[in-house]
Amino acid sequence: FLLAGMFPLLVIGIFSIASVRKQMLARYESLEKADGLRVASSLNDITTTVYSSSDTLLNSNQCLSLFAAESLDSGIEEQLTALERALQTYFENTAAVARIQIYTNNPNLQNSEHIHYQQNFVLDEWRKTLGNNWSTWASLQRYTAIVRQPYRELTLIRRIGVASSKYQAFLVVGLDRNTIKNHLEQSSNETTISLDGTQIIYATDSVLIGKDMEFPDDFSGYIYRYTGPKEIGNQMRLVNYVTLQSYKSNNLFYVRTVDPDALKTINHTVAVFVLILVLALLVPLILMICFSDYFSTRITTLKSAMHRASLGDYNIIEQFRGDDELSDTFKDLKLTVDAIHDKEAQFYEARIREQQLVNRQQQMEFEMLASQINPHFLYN
């Protein structure tokens, strides 16, 4: 009976808890996807804007001839000054840019704040990263100005078209870390960005920068998306991976957003519901067991009283706890026993009176007989 009553409640409770957990997980996953798309969109806006602005600076016939100049005449000097002015204006008006430099191996051009002559680029990190590509994004090692602490800087590297086989020119644009942070960090989620699926170039926790990003087991590179639980730092977290293909380059940005509290909240809610279900099952069960034991005790008491009455023992209990059908039955039994007891008492009283009457009659007969006997006869 208990199992029959509890089993439906148990099934409904388990189904409800599973449904609530599924809905909460789907809701958090939806929020995580939205935040991942927001971060990817912000990163795309920054990188696309920087790349498009560099197009405006470089896509001109002046750059073709300027960096191929064999001498510094007045015309070349004017072009060089105009380009330097354009670079300075762009640097001052673009908050996302931390530095902008053009490196060339043309010795005929004068050095300026943003244009530098360099005889060889082979050993430079940015040149190694560019390789044979015309443009690429890279995470380059930089140092703070005062204490010389190292940090990684997201950098656009572009090869500049030069109308000469002897000379080369390259544009290097470093992005400002604070600007990137202000655009990306707009929620409580932890954000991590990897360039081409290798080292982390940006992270909410700066300790992770430079380390390899952790991917799920099914990660195979290129365009990748995943939303769900994953172990991060020896803890299960709700994560979202989204891939951003950079504008006019072959780079892929892998954006990972992590909600550190989602699974904790879900598990806590499920635990509360499980506790409620256990209480909903346990409290009625305890009450039913107590009531059943109480009811069984009263049944046993009533049965014992009826059994004693059936054997002619009418000395049963006077009180019977409760106010239900069993109490009414006991009252009826008590009335019946009392009635039988009264009848028996009346019967025995009648028998006694009858016996007393017989005794009285016998005494009278004896007295009459005694009065008829001659005393002299008795004497003789």
Can you annotate each of these PLM segments?
Residues 155, 167-177, 234-271, 275:
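Short, hydrophobic beta-strand elements of compact beta-sandwich sensory domains
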Residues 77, 81, 89-175, 180-183:
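Extracytoplasmic/periplasmic ligand-binding sensor regions of membrane-associated signaling proteins
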Residues 1-22, 26:
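Extreme N-terminal signal-anchor transmembrane helix of membrane signaling/transducer proteins, especially
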Residues 331-371:
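Conserved signal-transmission helix
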Residues 33, 48-82, 100-116:
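Extracellular/periplasmic ligand-binding regions of membrane signal-transduction receptors
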Residues 13, 17-18, 276-296, 310, ...:
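Cytosolic-side ends of inner-membrane transmembrane helices, especially those
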Residues 127-162, 213-251:
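Membrane-proximal, non-catalytic sensory/regulatory domains of signal-transducing membrane proteins
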Residues 287, 291-321, 330, 334-337:
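Membrane-proximal alpha-helical signal-transduction linkers
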